[in-house]
Amino acid sequence: MYDVIVVGAGHAGCEAILAAARMGATCLLITSDLTAIARMSCNPAIGGMAKGQITREIDALGGEMAKAIDATGIQFRLLNRSKGPAMHSPRAQADRTLYSLYMRTIIEREPNIDLLQDTVIAIETKGECFAGVRITSSRVIEGKSAILTCGTFLNGLIHVGMNHFAGGRTIAEPPVVGLTENLCAHGFQAGRLKTGTPPRIDSRSIDYRKVDEQPGDIEPILFSFESKGALQSKQVSCFITKTTEETHAILRKGFERSPLFTGKVQGIGPRYCPSVEDKIFRFPDKNSHHIFLEPEGIDTNEMYVNGFSTSLPEDIQLEGLHSIPGLEQVKMIRPGYAIEYDYFYPHQIQATLETRLIENLYFAGQINGTSGYEEAAAQGLMAGINAVLKMRKHEPLILTRSDAYIGVLIDDLITKETNEPYRMFTSSAEHRLLLRHDNADIRLHEFGYRVGLLPEHRYQATRQKIEQINAVKTLLSQIRLESGLANKLLQELEYGEVTGAQQVTTLLKRPRVTLAKLLATSPELHSQLSNISNNPLVYEQVEIDCKYEGYLKRDALVAEKIQRLEAHHIPALLDYHAIAGLSNEGREKLKKHRPENIGQASRILGVSPSDISILMVHLGR
């Protein structure tokens, strides 16, 4: 009998199986195609707004995604450099073939992981507890717990124009039939969602004179806090072009053969990643939309047309591409398509990602209604950790909204109504100044170390970094820069003169004044700091902490107040009908979502502040 069975080997499944195995559990990974482990079926990239922060959080907890992209990335960029540090988000293009191979190699090296190429068609239970999985041969494999990471495979249906095919992720991959029905028979409620992907084109047929080059950063920021040294491969460029009014006219021609507009697609698509035809329909006043041409790897001519996700007929897709500058003679390797799939409403899971109906059964990834590799990987990691912690009768790992973007993601899933694919944004996190990509290791290393995923050397390295940050901050608060040196720097930055010696931390709070400029101005200051640390990452944290000190303190106080609400637990079987005074909508939503604490209850749509007050009085708070 296995300790943990993971069903599906996408990004959620990979993190789940690795976390459980590295924590010492005996694990089985079941997937319908072992050559497609961690396949990037859509965009060949990791990171981006909020997603880059999640990837670094996965790394800080001891997950693998950050190392995988560092090893197989072909272009690295830090987005939103012109904005504040809360908005900085790392992103990297991946060699999609190498990424999949990397993750398979890592999984095969783990001695606690067995692999099985098969399809799970049902789960088996004993009472209300998970007991095993049934595969296509009807054989039952017993396990103490299971994590379902089925992606878009559940009754997957692919649409290209008015044609549709059964498919799990691509036309070449069969869907999983029967598992949704089996879970519904156990009492779960399922819904239907849609996502899509753009056509792929031959890079040799692009006219590069008509597109704008977008190179990677000269000094790339890697994702893993453990990654050191040079990139594994030479960086490649992406390219930017845009649709035209002619493009829009061509695509409108195909609306009558669009599964989106003719009602053939019943699933709800992602609001913030719409198809190109949906953008044209929803924003008729816009004359053009940006198109990003992204290479799929070093040794392939295949290019991903980001911004042109579509399920229009093939002939319309190609004609539309030919109307875009630089793509007049482009050759289409494979068309874009939409895929519909089943998911399960996430109010049916707990904060640990264990299902409410069946004990020791966990859901992670798109089965919970999310979109994106990073969101899936984060859920897989947390499900893997919590499955093992529960098996050992240890306290679960539940990250709060002020701990991590991962905490925001899971909290949103279980408290908000999800009827469209959920994706993470920086705006989703009310504590985003605390949850930066650069401090993920500082925020989360204790959690990763406690559960046994973060190795000793990384834990100690982070502890040392924190000690150096504190020592540098203490030193800077005690040092004053004499007025001559201070004015020399301020004049260069077009500030007015100051009189008397200036405290270094006061100078550092000014816009455009950086620690690097202060050190260049004062060799003595540089020497004093060098005695503590020469680590630029330490200096970066010191500068951010100093510049945003007031905001950070205020945010921390707000987070502390919210934490007090999180400490007020609600009994799992509380009878909401017995609580007089609750609004009808509030009672209905509380009964549906079954919040675990007052904080969660307060974030449920439809539960009013007066409902929360009544609930707290009833619980004697």
From Swiss-Prot:
Binding, FAD: 8-13
InterPro entries reported in the protein's UniProt record: FAD/NAD-bd_sf (IPR036188), GIDA_C_N (IPR049312), MnmG (IPR004416), MnmG-rel (IPR002218), MnmG-rel_CS (IPR020595), MnmG_C (IPR026904), MnmG_C_subdom (IPR047001), MnmG_C_subdom_sf (IPR044920)
Keyword tRNA processing listed: yes
Compartments where located: Cytoplasm
UniProt name for this protein: tRNA uridine 5-carboxymethylaminomethyl modification enzyme MnmG
The protein's role, per its UniProt record: NAD-binding protein involved in the addition of a carboxymethylaminomethyl (cmnm) group at the wobble position (U34) of certain tRNAs, forming tRNA-cmnm(5)s(2)U34.
GO cellular component: cytosol
Alphabetical UniProt keywords: Cytoplasm, FAD, Flavoprotein, NAD, tRNA processing
Organism of this sequence: Chlorobium chlorochromatii (strain CaD3)
Cofactor(s) listed: FAD
Main location: cytoplasm
UniProt keyword Zinc-finger, yes or no: no
Molecular function, one GO term: flavin adenine dinucleotide binding
Annotated residues for binding of NAD(+): 269-283
